Every structure is written in C-alpha cells, then in structure tokens.
Amino acid sequence: SATTAEWTRRNLDETAKRYPAIAGNYHLDIADATQMPTLSQLDGTIDIVLTNPPYVPLADIPEQPEVRDYDPDLALYGGSADGTLIPERIIARAAKLLRAGGLMVMEHDITQGERLAAFARTCGFVDVTVHNDYTGRPRYLTAEKQPAQ
C-alpha cells in the first residue's frame, strides 16, 4: 500500500542518517512481488527469500483483534478461497530469483502446508519441508532451489 511504502521510506531514511556507513546497502523497490518482471535483474542471484505473504483464506476472519481490527486486508488475505494464490505466485517468483542451491522460507496457514510444498516441488525446489511452529501446528516451509549439477 502507499502508506506502507511511505513508512518504509521513512524507516530507510532514518537508518541512513543513523548509520551512514551502511546506508548504501539498502534499496527500496515498490512493486508486486508476485509478478515475474519484479526484480528480474536479480534472477538467479539471490541466496535466500524469506517471506510472510498474505495467506489467510478469504472466508477466514482472523480471531486476534489486533489483526482483525487493524491489519489491512491487503496484508492478510491470500487472494483465493483457500488463500494460496499469492503464496503460490511468490513461490514461482522465488524460483526465478534464487541461485541454484538458494533457500526459500515461507510462513503459511495451517491448512496450506502440503499444497504449497507440492507446488514448490513443481517449481524446481527440492528438500521441501513443512515445519511446525512452537504450538505444534504446521506454519512454515523451507525449500531449496535445485542445486547446480
């Protein structure tokens, strides 16, 4: 959202003022992470993609009031009835961005692990594993892009 982008710009500006020696390490691109042209100049060069995308199924209203009442829908809902549309698009994009042997880590809904893991495999990921959170619920996956042969 425009508001999120503005706050990110402010945070980057403040970081640059406080830590000028590392200011050049940061660059902000405002783009749709699910679209193939986004950051295409970096395809095949990224070591790790760490993502907490919108993944809530459209019919699921979050129980936590701090989420339900304050987080924008854009940050919550995964774009389809089961909430996997946006996560699957990000998996496909990550498969292009990552170098051979690169790692993707993605948070997801407790109902989505196996589907997203299967999709990651079709995108060329190996060693795909769904992991449990501290409460024992399947909440994130790790996947390695096929190493170079």
Model-derived features with residue positions:
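S-adenosylmethionine
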Residues: 1-147
